[in-house]
């Protein structure tokens, strides 16, 4: 049995959120292959880890906060991580960026201490992660808007390995624009099922 941490990051209400629809459908399929796994869902909008941002005022104590320790320990205690990752203005939601800031702590989640080449060594080596990405534009319209690649890179820096990202792209243009979030997810259901099977 595995423990699975699921991060909800959307600023939208659940009923209109494409990333919530994608995450729910993924978990539905995942449970078919892993019925005994424990699923822990955290809504970053409702937790300090997603709303306490790094600024000049918070920087002096940012990495000493209890919430930082709590989520580093949580990452070390689970086996799998699911990241719901919608695109907002070509980037991730601020809640997800804040989470990444909180858990990226030298000598806790990464280290340069034993590096032979000067690059970082990730210390969160117990985890496999799955990104469930959503974006309004079709893939390739805005090459600089690679929000899922940023998240994957930041998490790999910490030592986390990844299943192939699932991306629901083009939700703000026809033909997907005319569909409900759940219907949009069904257009990539084969990818969702494959990801659930291999995760």
UniProtKB/Swiss-Prot annotation:
Q: Which GO terms describe its molecular function?
A: electron transfer activity; FMN binding; oxidoreductase activity, acting on NAD(P)H as acceptor; oxidoreductase activity, acting on NAD(P)H, quinone or similar compound as acceptor
Please write the reaction equations for the catalytic activity of this protein. 2 a quinone + NADH + H(+) = 2 a 1,4-benzosemiquinone + NAD(+); N,N-dimethyl-1,4-phenylenediamine + anthranilate + 2 NAD(+) = 2-(4-dimethylaminophenyl)diazenylbenzoate + 2 NADH + 2 H(+)
Identify the Pfam families for this entry.
Flavodoxin_2
Binding of FMN occurs at 17-19, 87-90
Cofactor annotation:
FMN
Q: Which InterPro entries match?
A: Flavodoxin_fold, Flavoprotein-like_sf, FMN-dep_NADH:Q_OxRdtase_AzoR1, NADH:quinone_OxRdtase_FMN_depd
Q: What class of enzyme is it?
A: oxidoreductase
What is the top-level taxon of the source organism?
A: Bacteria
Any note on cofactor binding? Answer: Binds 1 FMN per subunit.
**What are the protein's UniProt keywords?**
Flavoprotein, FMN, NAD, Oxidoreductase
- Could you tell me what this protein does? Quinone reductase that provides resistance to thiol-specific stress caused by electrophilic quinones.
The record's similarity note reads: Belongs to the azoreductase type 1 family.
Fill in the subunit field for this protein: Homodimer.
What is the protein's given name?
FMN-dependent NADH:quinone oxidoreductase
Naturally occurring in which organism (per UniProt): Mycoplasma capricolum subsp. capricolum (strain California kid / ATCC 27343 / NCTC 10154)
